[in-house]
Amino acid sequence: SYRILTEKIFGSNHPYGYNSTEQNIRSVGTPDILSHWQLNYQTTDSFIIVAGNVTNTILQKIEDNFGHIGLKKTPTRTDLKDIERDMRPIKSFKLEKTQSSVKIGIDCVSRQHDDFDGMFVFNTVLGGYFNSRLNNVIREAKGLTYNIFSTHDTYLYGGLFYISADTSQDQVIKMNTEIYTQIDKLLDKPIPKAELERVRGYLLGTLMTSFDGVYNCVETLRSCLIEGVDFASVQQLINKIATIETTEVMETGRRNLSIDNLIEVVIG
């Protein structure tokens, strides 16, 4: 369901929507892998991150082992924002299965966008953690699914916001209706203060782990570099979480989510 969702949102010819097939994989040979490595990894965009107790001896060993590798100029890349996307709504794909996997999504902002921090909070309230609205209402209170969450995937050129859930075939319509109801409520009604404070505490606590030890620090820096944002953006995100008010969460959601444009995929 995820593969179909990304294809329908971004388009089958878009790198974020392209899906490989068995035939594609079988046709790949060693020369193809080597060429891909040279064009996309062995370039001037490549970097090495070293953290911890780094001595001059360690730096010299890194230089001795990697400094001789010839890097090619990074090729001109197509700005993926300019690639035409296939946004034709596809409501469902039916297979003979007793269980159904549901994905409901829309293309969204990247980490470079001003709305990212607000969407980070919006997603958490809706379905980004165990005490989220989707989980509390649809899983815990109504028992319509055994697994539901929302997530905001971000890439260098854009992002993807989607809701994922699994349920029995006879509960799909009822569950999806409730999903849209919860989205509507979050877009239209202020978040209670206690709920927003709970989300703040959860997110700030979670982000602390991003700097817990050298390995987590390296991973945090790596993700910033790959997605085209400064390391200071993490502190900006923390500041936004600590100060954002319910009105801003609602307004950010309205700018980036439209129920009429959501694409729904049902497998099973």
Task: Label the model's feature ranges.
Residues 74-131:
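His/Glu-based metal-binding/catalytic segments typifying zinc-dependent metallopeptidases
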Residues 6-7, 123-127, 136, 223:
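Generic alpha-helical structural context detector
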Residues 1-74, 110, 118, 140-268:
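Charge-rich, well-structured scaffold segments of protease-associated domains
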Residues 125-144, 155:
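M16/MPP (pitrilysin/insulinase) zinc-metallopeptidase core fold and M16-derived inactive scaffolds
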